[in-house]
Regions:
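Family-positioned intrinsically disordered, low-complexity linker/tail segments enriched in G/S/T/P
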Residues: 2-129
Length: 129
C-alpha cells in the first residue's frame, strides 16, 4: 500500500513539473553606472544631476521604445548608480520591451546642474553578458 502511494505521489509530481514548466522572464530593471562630468570635463561630485535614459530599437539613432528620467546624486568620484526601469517614465513601458526584437541601444543624456537641460553624453549597444 505504501509503495503504491509513493508511486502515485511521484507520478503526480512529475506531471506537475511537466504540465507547468517555468518560463524565463525579462528583467524589469537594469543596473547602470556612469561618471558625470561638466562641460569643462571636471567631475561633478556629491550633487544631484538630471538624467534622461532612452532605450532605442534598431540602431544608435533608432526609435525610442522607452524613455525615463532620474535625478540621482553623484558620489565623491562623480559616479552615479541607477536602476533603469525605476525612474519617472516619459514614454513606453520597460516591461513591454521585446528584447528578442533588437538590437537595442541605450542613450544617456545628462544635465550636471540637476535640471532638465539634457545633452547627449553617450549611446551604446546593449549586449547580453
Amino acid at each position: 500500500m505504501k509503495k503504491n502511494f509513493l508511486k502515485t505521489i511521484m507520478v503526480l509530481g512529475a506531471l506537475t513539473l511537466y504540465l507547468f514548466p517555468a518560463y524565463g522572464q525579462s528583467p524589469e530593471k537594469m543596473s547602470y553606472q556612469a561618471v558625470i562630468r561638466n562641460s569643462s570635463d571636471q567631475l561633478v561630485t556629491d550633487q544631484l544631476v538630471g538624467m534622461q535614459i532612452s532605450i532605442l530599437q534598431g540602431s544608435a539613432s533608432g526609435t525610442a521604445v522607452y524613455v525615463e528620467t532620474q535625478t540621482p546624486t553623484t558620489n565623491a568620484n562623480g559616479l552615479v548608480s541607477i536602476e533603469i526601469g525605476s525612474g519617472t517614465i516619459v514614454s513606453g513601458s520597460f516591461a513591454d520591451i521585446d528584447w528578442a526584437n533588437g538590437p537595442y541601444f541605450i542613450e544617456t543624456e545628462t544635465d550636471p546642474t540637476g535640471g532638465t537641460n539634457y545633452t547627449i553624453t553617450g549611446t551604446s549597444q546593449l549586449l547580453s553578458v
